């Protein structure tokens, strides 16, 4: 199964290398993966980190692409990613998350067993304890905030 890994980022220079490293370390065949990275017009060095990942791993994965999201918002970033992905399934991961090295392979097994949507636990890391960041952490720790994989007719329904 050809998998698209998607990360949407905005001003994540202090966290983005962690998830990019986790993507690079996946035990799933990299020739069956593409990585779609979307930068929301970051004002820090996030885009440079994404470009460095692309340059370093462009020959390791089937495809690595860095896209711009001038509207900056997360929903707009996902629209950019959804227009670009080529895989049979999309795996969404957050820019400030960590995933185990078997995250993709476990999700693929579930999808290949007949499920249309699956996900997995992954810790979300916050860089400082503030009421707002703790609220976001709580939301992202829920089922609806977690990383998910989807296969099916998303292109026809949501484009």
Q: Language-model segments: what does each one mean?
A:
Residues 90:
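Short aromatic/hydrophobic "clamp" motif used to bind/position activated sugar donors
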Residues 101-134:
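Conserved donor NDP-sugar-binding/catalytic core segment of glycosyltransferases
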Residues 21-32:
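Short, acidic, metal-binding catalytic loop of nucleotide-sugar glycosyltransferases
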Residues 32-41, 65-68:
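Short beta-strand/loop segment that forms part of the nucleotide-sugar
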Residues 120-127, 136-159:
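Short, flexible, basic/aromatic active-site loop/helix in glycosyltransferases
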Residues 69-85, 106:
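Glycine-rich, basic loop-to-helix element that forms the pyrophosphate-binding segment
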Residues 22, 39-48, 71, 97:
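A conserved acidic beta->alpha catalytic loop
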Residues 2-4, 34:
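Cell-envelope/extracellular polymer assembly enzymes that use nucleotide-activated donors
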